[in-house]
Amino acid sequence: MEAVRLIGVGRRALAQSQDAPDIMREAWQAQALAQAMGSRLAMLGPPELRGDALSLSEAGARGSGGSAVPVVGAGGIRAAQLTELGEVDRALRELGALLGDVGIALVAVASESFEEGAYWQCMEAIDAADESRDRVLEILRRLPEHDDRMHGRHGPAPGSDSAA
């Protein structure tokens, strides 16, 4: 499944989450997707972005691993369905938005948590989502100089004035 479509599924699932375990599960799913997208970009992207892409993959792994992994549910791990990144800049912008939404949802869960362990679990998940989002933003910041290569174009973009 294409990355933007998977991200959309994740955003809808997060919006429909009714309680803390559902939100934590969606945070975990988002981090697993960040890991998968970072890995794919590291393998297939331009060499100059591979270090940043690996950092995204590692940040996603930290946020989707550990002893506090929620039960994934009947749908399984969505990131395992990733078959292509598609339009890389759009996929990264959407992933960044998803990770931002996850952070906001986790803040709400943490503020309502009465159990200290659950509170700190939320705080760790917030930090992980923020770190992954920072990595996405860094890749996006550097991506425009590689945009033509990422879309398979080797000349001026259609409609640009530099072709004259």
Model-derived regions: residue spans:
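Short, charged, low-complexity loops and linkers
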Residues: 9-18, 79-90
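Charged, amphipathic alpha-helical oligomerization/scaffolding segments
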Residues: 22-36, 55, 59-62, 94-104, ...
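Short, charged/polar, low-complexity loop and linker segments
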Residues: 74-87, 108-117
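Short, flexible helical or helix-coil boundary motifs
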Residues: 14, 60-64, 147
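Leu/Val/Ala/Ile-rich N-terminal alpha-helices, chiefly Sec-type signal peptides and the beginnings
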Residues: 1-49
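Alpha-helical segments in soluble extracytoplasmic regions
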Residues: 42-78
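Preference for long, well-ordered alpha-helical segments
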Residues: 101, 105-164
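Residue-level recognition of alpha-helical structural elements
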Residues: 19, 23, 45, 49, ...
